[in-house]
Structure formats: C-alpha cells, structure tokens
Amino acid sequence: REDPYLYKVVSCLLANGEVIDEVTQPLGVRHYEIVAGKGFYLNGEKYPMYGVTRHQDWWGLGSALTNREHDFDLAQIMDVGATTVRFAHYQQSEYLYSRCDTLGLIIWAEIPFVNRVTGYESENAQTQLRELIRQSFNHPSIYVWGLHNEVHQPHEYTASLTQSLHDLAKTEDPDRYTIAVNGYGHANHPVNQNTDIQGMNRYFGWYEKKVQDIKPWVEGLEKDYPWQKLML
C-alpha cells in the first residue's frame, strides 16, 4: 500500500504502418513469497497480511454492482487498514482487480468450487480456473489462485481433482501460489494436501468457543505442521 507504482505495457497492432488496434496492460514489478512459520514477504521484506473477505453482493442489487458500489466497498476495506483481500468465492469484477492494482492491495482470486461435490464438476472447474488465470494474469495485485473452499467428501475424488487443478494452475501460471481452504480444523486432511498453501477456516467466537481461543489453536498448528504454509 505504501507505493503501488504501476508501469504500462502498450501492445499495438500495425497495418501498413498505422495502428489499427491497441491494448494497454498494467505491469507491476513485485515479488511475493510465503515462508512456512514466518509469514508473507513482499519484495524480500516481511509484510503484514491484514485481511478481509469480500463478496460481490449488495442488498437489493445482488451481484449486479456498478463501479460505484465496488469503490464504496474498497474504500471501507482501505479505511480499516486491510492490506489483503480474498475475493470469495468466485471471479469478481475486472474493475476490482484493476483498482486493487492501483491501491496496492494484495489479492486472492478464486473459482466457485464450494462445499458440495457432485462428481461431475471436473471439466467445469478446470475451465473456470483456466479462464480466471488467463483473464487476470496481468494483474500484479493477485498473488494466489484459490481452487476450492471447504469442499468435503468424497475425499479421494476431491483430492484427485484438487491435484489436477493445481497442475493446471502451474501450467498456466508457474509463478503464483495455489490455495485450497480447509473447513475441518486440522491441517492433515487429504483433500487439502495438493496446493502450495492451505487455508484454514475455523470461526472461534462465532460457531464455537471464544475469539481468544484462536491463539493456542494456531500455535498448535505451527508446532505440529512446521512445513505448512497456512492462511487463516
């Protein structure tokens, strides 16, 4: 957020020496790294990940938001001091990704593979992931591709599909991370072993226990799984 400087790459199509089409894309020179047990690094320096999740949904409008509503949400996100946003659980407006490039927010983008498994979603999930990556590849704000959220059994099928999605993401974009979100509360579930990062959803103070109980739980995860890159 301190200095989200962007360059511009201008691609021109020429015919007989004249420009007949032109596309301008953002170029942000940055390096993301996550080190297990230590945290997130931006351009080689430790960077705080103060995050929120954002849904593209307003009362009375549903998902059919204008840029005015997108800007309102982003203003609230900036005002609370967030440095990173998860756009869940689906591809959101192209305008949002572009605004996050200019604001210096670090983005988690994902496909709508959530909770339930039918056994028939493989082709659709791969198509949506491929399209998400190809459409959003040039946004420097995006650091990770989300493959699924709290997807439950059948475990063997879901683990295999997650591996194929991870492989697809690495083929399309070998330099960004992948993540799958775990709703089980422990880090060794087979469904969540096939991505670079493991997201952990557990809602202390909401569905169970107290907010303060998250600290010993996280410390236990770090002790038991020191090699895991974890996001909460």
Q: Model segments located where?
A:
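Substrate-binding/catalytic cleft of secreted carbohydrate-active enzymes
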Residues: 74-75, 84-232
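Secreted/periplasmic carbohydrate-active enzymes, especially glycoside hydrolases
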Residues: 1-91, 97-99, 103-107, 128, ...
